[in-house]
Amino acid sequence: MVSYASDVKKELTSLPVHPEHAKAELAAFLRMNGVLSLHDHQFSLDITTENPAIARRIFSLIKTAYGIEPLLIVSKKMKLKKNYQYLVRLQKQVHEILTDLEIFDSNNGLITGIPEKIMSSEQRAMSYLRGAFLASGSVNNPETSRYHLEIYSLYEDHNQDLLKLMNNFFYLNAKETRRRSGYIVYLKEAEKIGDFLHIVGAVNAMLAFEDLRIMRDMRNSVNRLVNCDTANLKKTANAAAKQVEDIQLIEEKFGLENLPEKLTVLARFRLTHPELSLKEVAAQVPDGPISKSGVNHRFQKIREIAKQLKEEN
């Protein structure tokens, strides 16, 4: 069974490789997963993965950034599940590339932190975070597990730099901790996980995550209201889910900002409060309070607009 994290990585590996940003993404791969060898006074750099899409991504990044085609070696593991293993081997200009990416310093020493040119550029930071997640990141399925996204680092200073990228540029409220022989940065807030997926370019995965999160949170809210009438709860949840679906369609096809102001306010409030009943929405909507029938009338208008957009498409 393909995991949710695998789906996210599949989407990321399908993104176009931008020449200006390839080096930042490649730097994350090589710094986090590269294995350097020296034979006959020649450097060789290997990156191994069981994911063929990631292997192709690394190949494309190297070719785009430096015009070099590395070797791509496929082998079959003989232990456990006997999966295929993909090795990307760079044998040309290894020293020059590692120096250019600031993985080596001028004295051929290893730099384990993230270079300043990435730490000071939001666009490069986005590309580096994408590479870091592909190299050693994971995210739980929002439908079945607790909300959790993490990236593993071998070195503490690299982990702290990842934390700074995530928090200083993108305000993700990331945390850090020690993990066995290394370190991790992690996110626990569902909203921040969705933001991270969007930042690194996994837009479809982010939309799927948000849909699952909304439905999961709605189910949890329903379960907490144990003293309420079950039939009424189901009716409220179903109505809210349909309203959210209509609003999301309008947002995608038309833009909420193009609605009349009263409908825009209500639509955005409903997206952030899918668990509220019609009565609660009427009492708490920002331009309210208004009557329950007034709220219902606005939702009917939203429903009509969504229906029209469906028919047009």
Curated annotation (Swiss-Prot):
Keywords: Cell cycle, Cell division, DNA-binding. GO terms for molecular function: DNA binding. InterPro entries: Homing_endonucl (IPR027434), Sporu_reg_WhiA_N_dom (IPR018478), Sporulation_regulator_WhiA (IPR003802), Sporulation_regulator_WhiA_C (IPR023054), WhiA_LAGLIDADG_dom (IPR039518). Residues 277-311 bind DNA. The keyword Ubl conjugation does not apply. One of its GO terms (biological process) is regulation of sporulation. PANTHER family: CELL DIVISION PROTEIN WHIA-RELATED. NCBIfam families: DNA_bind_WhiA. Involved in cell division and chromosome segregation. Belongs to the WhiA family. This is Probable cell division protein WhiA.
